[in-house]
Amino acid sequence: MPEKSKYGRFGTGAPLGMGRWGFIAPELAQFAYALFTVLFILFTWTGLDNPQSLLWERMSMLSGTIALWLVYQLWPCRFVMACRVGYLLMMLGMWYPDTYELNKQFGSFDHIVAAWDQHIFGCQPALLFSQIHNSKIVSELMYLGYFSYYLFFIVTTYVIFFLDYRQLERVTYMIFGGFFACYVIFALFPVTGPQYYYLAVGMDEIAAGNLPDIGHHFASTQECLTPPGWQDGVGYQLCHMMHQAGERPTAAFPSSHVAIATLVMLIVARMRMWKYLIFLALPYLFLCLATVYIMAHYAIDSIAGLFTGLALFLLFGGLKLQKV
């Protein structure tokens, strides 16, 4: 009888590499998303700036996955598996801004989402939050909370790797499946977020509740507002560094930060890793608040992210990976 997992209700798990030809489930999720984007590119070829380059980028990214898979066939050990998963994590930094290249041909739907905020709250929470709570302490808590996003999916992946290796494939499948599900939404429903939309419309217009359709404005510009808060703070500087590295006018609805963090919290709770769950609790709270505070998201984006994370958990958590 197989040994029971120390942390679990995910069952005992199975040896890693149970997918077809030895690919692990998160790699298969990446292949599926890559196929979606290839078909997307082919069907929208004339609306894209450089479709040939986009196809080449996919070949390059997937070739790294295949190369590490080949190494694992020759040297099947945990170190190489850690590299395979690490490469997938690194490639998220490529897939995320790539959604901008796919969706900018459609124009922005910010006016719709901002109108939802206006209708529900009677104001623009992203505009007022940082104005009302403008102390250095609040600013640092918000930015450190926002930066803790990487704690949720990167650190958690390797916590599982070291504490419960047998669960690694299933957990990473859920996390990467969650990311790619969000990226599909981003490609089909472009929303840039307040930091871009507010600047394009004008702060006075936003404050007055005027939320016009700006069409394809962001197809030719990536200019955004300077994020609010204490600019000399460590958290602010960390987030600014990440923003400069890969932020684009895309991926606001739903908030993938909230969706993935919620998904991870549910995974950790289901695995009964209570100490780790308590450790994540405050960063999770500040992360959810920070998405609106720093003007990365409308309030409705974060609310939608919460429900998206729950839906992803119910979807992927109920699936059992089968040995092929």
PLM features: what roles do these ranges have?
Residues 35-44, 91-96, 179-187, 282-293:
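Aromatic-anchored segments of alpha-helical transmembrane domains
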Residues 82-87, 154-190, 195-208:
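Interfacial segments of alpha-helical transmembrane regions
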Residues 4-7, 75-76, 318-324:
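Membrane-interface capping segments at transmembrane-helix boundaries
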Residues 232-324:
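Membrane-embedded catalytic cores of phosphoryl/pyrophosphoryl-handling enzymes
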Residues 48-52, 72-84, 160-171, 272-274:
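Membrane-interface helix-boundary motifs at transmembrane edges
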Residues 2-60, 79-153:
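N-terminal transmembrane-helix/juxtamembrane module of multi-pass inner/ER membrane proteins
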Residues 188-270:
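Membrane-interfacial catalytic/cofactor-binding modules of polytopic membrane enzymes
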Residues 60-73:
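Central hydrophobic cores of alpha-helical transmembrane segments in multi-pass inner-membrane proteins
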